[in-house]
């Protein structure tokens, strides 16, 4: 079972860089990278709100659940 983080896809669709998003939401690029690679242990609701606001998306567009085969 895995949670897949689709931030790269959303950023590409919006022609936005990770650095630009990080700056807009007040997060370091390093911490955003940890989130993008799925290495984050937790995500604050306030961070999700900021990402969704800037990317004009829903939380379910950022994360998806994939079962192991």
Show which residues each predicted segment covers:
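Short alpha-helical DNA-recognition segment
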Residues: 16-34
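A short, Lys/Arg-rich alpha-helix, primarily the initiator
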Residues: 1-16
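Short, charged recognition helix plus adjacent turn
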Residues: 9, 34, 41, 63-69
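The alpha-helix within a helix-turn-helix
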Residues: 11, 22, 52
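Residue at a beta-strand N-cap/secondary-structure junction
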Residues: 15, 42-45
């Amino acid at each position: 079972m895995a949670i897949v983080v689709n931030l790269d896809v959303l950023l590409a669709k919006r022609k936005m860089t990770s650095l630009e998003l990080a700056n807009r939401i007040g997060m370091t690029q390093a911490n955003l990278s940890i989130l993008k690679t799925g290495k984050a242990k937790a995500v604050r609701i306030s961070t999700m709100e900021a990402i969704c606001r800037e990317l004009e998306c829903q939380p379910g567009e950022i994360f998806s659940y994939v079962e192991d085969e």
